[in-house]
Amino acid sequence: VRESNREGGCPGDGGAIDNADVTVTIDRSHGSERLAQRVIRCRPGRSGPRRLESSQELLFVESGHGTLQVAGDEHLLEPDMGAYVVSGEEYELENAGPEELVVVVVEAPLELGTAIDPARRTVRYADRPVLRAGADREFRYLVNQDVGCLDLTQFVGLIAPGRAPDHSHIYDEIVYIIEGEGILHLGGQEKVIGPGSAVHLPPLAEHCLENTGKGSMRVLGVFHPSGDPASRAYESE
């Protein structure tokens, strides 16, 4: 489990995201070969440009308001919004202030190409339908094949209080805790998780996110290959 504490600098080869604090939460050094996650906390103003080469980035606005500027177009950013940028594109983040603009970014190789529609580059959580993932869980898709992302799926899920059966997925996933507290059960170990915690779940890893709070736990998930968050490779009785 990694926590999104502040660090300076910007990872990757695409150029600096200046005017911001950047924290790498998950990458190869943490055992994730394909997916990398970082949290960007933008101060008021505009960042420098970042260009993607052979990769794609799925952005999630955790808090704050601003704009995403890509290919001469401006896209408004607000909390609980997903956004999609692909190889060959250059983008900038602008924070109108006065509060921080906090963006959670997952980067992955571009493998199947893209069918991105620039007019649908951003996706509002409030506009997406609620889907079930078991009796006590629900989710909404953000960036997925509906907006032209063929390799990855991004979603926000709600986990009710309590512990569901241990289970596994065929996909490779990074989970980020937006809201709520609980316990991660993974590999025979238990770790406390809360807002800002980031978890890498390799394919077929048996796990459970137990919600120890009184309200729903809200999580951001991004996984490869693209698919259904409700699918299970295994579930205990």
Question: Which residue stretches match the model-derived regions?
Answer:
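A short, N-terminal "cap"/entry segment at the start of jelly-roll beta-barrel domains
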Residues: 1-34, 98-152, 234-237
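Ligand-binding loop in jelly-roll beta-barrel domains
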Residues: 31, 87-112, 203-229
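Glycine- and acidic-residue-biased ligand/ion/polar-headgroup-sensing regions
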Residues: 54-67, 170-183, 187
